[in-house]
Amino acid sequence: MKNQFLASIGLFAASAFSQAVIDSGTGFGTYYYDIEQVEACGTSFDNQNLGFVECNFFTGLSLDQINSNYLVAMNHTQIAGNLADYCGKRVIVTANGVQSDLPLFIGDGCQRCGTGSKTNTVWNPNGAPGLDFSYSVLSELNSNACFAGHIDISWEIVDETLYDFDTNAPGQPTGPVNQRRSVNQRSERATRRRR
């Protein structure tokens, strides 16, 4: 009886901390920018880093301005259909059977990721389902990223906001959610101390 009770508590705790899955899939991971390694794998990311991301549609925000290698691009058609559903949401990626704990978040659209069959298991540079990453992140997911140019992945986009864009948090400052919460929490503690 005691073991059943403990098992029930464990299941309850696990479900309480899991987030709802918004989207999931399998396909290919590629890279298209890098903030930290602007020159990597025989590529210069200078121009890509200046491009505006799809999720900050109203005010324009470049990859350089976001200043994070954790931004991920997903199927352009899907994200364009409802920016608020996907922008800033956490992405959990699995490569080589290992689930990443990197704080990845959706921030851009990927044209290649929205074409090709979702059931296709053969790489096609003109259209294959998947996600687009920074070079640094893709290299961390798989050390063959530079040599191969793409890796096999699976992913889940979960209902946890890691970054606020003008499309998913209108009227709020753009930026990492946890950083802003930390600032707000420090401000609240300072206010309480003054009372």
Model-derived segments and spans:
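Classical eukaryotic N-terminal signal peptides for Sec-dependent ER targeting/secretion
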Residues: M1-G10
